[in-house]
């Protein structure tokens, strides 16, 4: 782990700085630069027909302005006074005997970058207090619709604005500060260890679920207690399903005994910040000729896209380049036929690369602010989660892929207009590959990028790691004790 990251993360999460940025964003959106920002954290919620609570996940916008991962909490930012107040649950004697004492206000003030910490029972009183001085009271409170509990009252304010706060926070979240980038880098460092553990164990694994268990346990060992999303461990044809998550198929082919490639798309989360990394692994220790050919195309797609990444570049153009590289590679293999320009204009490559090249990343894996247009009539751009130009300190994924999904490709084969562009006889050799995707996480800079992802992706290096063949899992039986 990078000591420079440790040094940055030794400080507090910059909630006060974020609050000021959001206030500036509100002003830029036409607000008068006055008022109170109000946000609520996630409430404790019980599972249906159970006395267990639903697993807790903090609201991202609340965390952005508080850095607080406690349930049933609140935060206010008085723009006029530049005062950030955190409200946390007081001790409940009935709960203390089960879960221990909660964090005190004094402890919270040392942990969180806020000016004041108060019990959550004082929220309404403090909102009223903001308006006590009629000469200097904030006239407006900013809140997010459907994110305010019925017990909260904004009656002391002249106006409640429900329209601009969420968008202002999302605009600020697009551009990461040094602390956030350090969190994302640490999440990547941990996930790199987990990916390597899966690579090393993959040659002896018997089932996809074993590899998921290794990934999750390695993340937990390094203090990543949540996954950014459900891990994808897709052997062979399962890799053609973009978000396959069954993760329970035996590795060896039941007929031939062959061990195909594995598409692993998995990332641990660190202190609310995500990672999103994808690799393809030869489970036998060596890629099949067909899998290696597709792997080389996808890696070429990614590397050529890397050459475009910098501030001011239109993401649509980077995505289009990925398709052009894919077309060239598939033509060279004989899967596609025709001129490369005609294939691009007809969108034939969408049959093999149906998703967008990447997305913003931060507290959410598919982070906010990407401005997608899922109604775009052009199928090549319909599923792009990011539209527009890149800016410094935005964090994006670059994740090209080539897939052999019958559900997606067969309509092209049946199309009177498009079937002529695909050689089905050549294609038949590649169905078993399933899919190959290679994904890294990049910080955009003025002149290029910083790659946060360190998982090996050179094909020969990946094969060498897999060939080490360490045991996937050593289970201890009760009979061995």
From Swiss-Prot:
<dbReference type="InterPro" id="IPR052433">
    <property type="entry name" value="X-Pro_dipept-like"/>
</dbReference>
<feature type="binding site">
    <location>
        <position position="439"/>
    </location>
    <ligand>
        <name>Mn(2+) 1</name>
    </ligand>
</feature>
<keyword id="KW-0031">Aminopeptidase</keyword>
<dbReference type="GO" id="GO:0006508">
    <property type="term" value="P:proteolysis"/>
</dbReference>
<dbReference type="GO" id="GO:0070006">
    <property type="term" value="F:metalloaminopeptidase activity"/>
</dbReference>
<feature type="binding site">
    <location>
        <position position="276"/>
    </location>
    <ligand>
        <name>Mn(2+) 2</name>
    </ligand>
</feature>
<dbReference type="InterPro" id="IPR029149">
    <property type="entry name" value="Creatin/AminoP/Spt16_N"/>
</dbReference>
<keyword id="KW-0378">Hydrolase</keyword>
<keyword id="KW-0464">Manganese</keyword>
<keyword id="KW-0482">Metalloprotease</keyword>
<protein>
    <recommendedName>
        <fullName>Probable Xaa-Pro aminopeptidase PEPP</fullName>
        <ecNumber>3.4.11.9</ecNumber>
    </recommendedName>
</protein>
<feature type="binding site">
    <location>
        <position position="276"/>
    </location>
    <ligand>
        <name>Mn(2+) 1</name>
    </ligand>
</feature>
<comment type="function">
    <text>Catalyzes the removal of a penultimate prolyl residue from the N-termini of peptides.</text>
</comment>
<dbReference type="InterPro" id="IPR000994">
    <property type="entry name" value="Pept_M24"/>
</dbReference>
<keyword id="KW-0645">Protease</keyword>
<feature type="binding site">
    <location>
        <position position="399"/>
    </location>
    <ligand>
        <name>Mn(2+) 1</name>
    </ligand>
</feature>
<keyword id="KW-0479">Metal-binding</keyword>
<dbReference type="InterPro" id="IPR036005">
    <property type="entry name" value="Creatinase/aminopeptidase-like"/>
</dbReference>
<dbReference type="GO" id="GO:0030145">
    <property type="term" value="F:manganese ion binding"/>
</dbReference>
<comment type="similarity">
    <text>Belongs to the peptidase M24B family.</text>
</comment>
<dbReference type="Pfam" id="PF05195">
    <property type="entry name" value="AMP_N"/>
</dbReference>
<dbReference type="InterPro" id="IPR007865">
    <property type="entry name" value="Aminopep_P_N"/>
</dbReference>
<feature type="binding site">
    <location>
        <position position="439"/>
    </location>
    <ligand>
        <name>Mn(2+) 2</name>
    </ligand>
</feature>
<dbReference type="Pfam" id="PF00557">
    <property type="entry name" value="Peptidase_M24"/>
</dbReference>
<feature type="binding site">
    <location>
        <position position="265"/>
    </location>
    <ligand>
        <name>Mn(2+) 2</name>
    </ligand>
</feature>
């Amino acid at each position: 782990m990078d000591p420079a990251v440790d040094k940055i993360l030794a400080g507090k999460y910059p909630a006060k700085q974020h609050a000021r940025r959001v206030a500036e964003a509100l002003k830029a959106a036409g607000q008068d630069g006055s008022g109170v920002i109000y946000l609520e954290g996630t409430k404790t919620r019980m599972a249906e027909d159970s006395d267990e609570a639903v697993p807790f996940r903090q609201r991202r916008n609340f965390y952005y302005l508080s850095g607080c991962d406690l349930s049933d909490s609140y935060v206010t930012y008085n723009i006029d006074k530049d005062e950030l107040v955190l409200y946390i649950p007081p001790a409940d004697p009935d709960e203390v005997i089960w879960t221990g004492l909660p964090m005190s206000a004094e402890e919270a003030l040392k942990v969180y970058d806020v000016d004041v910490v108060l019990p959550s029972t004082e929220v309404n009183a403090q909102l009223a207090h903001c308006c006590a001085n009629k000469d200097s009271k904030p006239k407006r409170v900013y809140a997010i619709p459907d994110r305010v509990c019925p017990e909260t009252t904004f009656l002391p304010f002249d106006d409640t604005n429900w329209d601009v706060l969420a968008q202002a926070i999302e605009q600020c979240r697009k551009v990461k500060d040094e602390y956030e980038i350090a969190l994302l880098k640490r999440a990547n460092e941990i996930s790199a260890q987990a990916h390597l553990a899966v690579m090393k164990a993959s040659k002896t694994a018997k089932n996809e679920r074993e590899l998921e268990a290794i990934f999750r346990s390695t993340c937990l060992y390094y203090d990543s207690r949540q996954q950014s999303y459900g891990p994808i461990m897709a052997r062979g044809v399962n890799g053609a399903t973009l978000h396959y998550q069954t993760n329970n198929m035996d590795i060896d082919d039941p007929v031939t005994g062959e061990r195909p490639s594995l598409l692993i798309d998995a990332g641990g989360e660190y202190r609310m910040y995500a990672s999103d990394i994808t690799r393809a692994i030869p489970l036998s220790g060596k890629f099949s000729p067909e899998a290696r050919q597709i792997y080389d195309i996808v890696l070429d797609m990614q590397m050529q896209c890397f050459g475009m990444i910098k501030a001011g570049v239109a993401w649509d153009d980077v995505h289009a380049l990925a398709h052009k590289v894919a077309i060239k590679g598939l033509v060279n293999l004989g899967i596609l036929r025709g001129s490369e320009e005609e294939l691009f204009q007809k969108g034939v490559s969408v049959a093999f690369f149906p998703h967008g090249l990447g997305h913003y990343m931060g507290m959410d894996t598919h982070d906010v602010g990407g401005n997608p247009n899922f109604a775009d009539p052009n199928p090549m751009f319909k599923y792009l989660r990011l539209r527009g130009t890149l800016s410094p300190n935005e964090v994006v994924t670059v994740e090209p892929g080539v897939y052999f999904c019958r559900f997606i490709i067969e309509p092209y084969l049946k199309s009177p207009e498009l079937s002529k562009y695909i050689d089905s006889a050549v294609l038949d050799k590649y169905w078993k590959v399933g899919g190959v995707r290679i994904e890294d996480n990049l910080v955009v800079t003025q002149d290029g990028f910083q790659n946060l992802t360190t998982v090996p992706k050179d094909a020969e290096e990946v094969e060498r790691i897999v060939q080490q063949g360490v045991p996937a899992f050593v289970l201890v039986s009760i009979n061995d004790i």
